[in-house]
Amino acid sequence: MNEIVGDLWHEHAAGAVVAITTNGMVTKSGKSIMPRGCARQAADRYPELTRLLGSLLINHGNHVFDLGRKLVSFPVEEDPYRNPEMRLIEQSCRELVELTDYKGWQKVVV
């Protein structure tokens, strides 16, 4: 792991997979709630993500998912209006490592 400072989307454009910090909430219409930070930026860039992630959350729970487009969800909280949960962050770290190994990704930026 290397710590870098920079723009997630610059790294994404350069070929890195970007892990988007997310929560487990879904609207009545089945869309994930992506209200701020890199989740909001991703939803603004790729509007279909809210429906895709919402469907995955409904069917599989709050986990790391390959969302396509070199994007993955990285759950940090169950509810966007509460503090991030260490238990969930640890789970997401384990799942991201497994997915990265499985996919053979060379660079993932969180």
Model region roles, listed by residue range:
Residues 1-109:
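Macrodomain-like recognition of ADP-ribose-binding/processing modules
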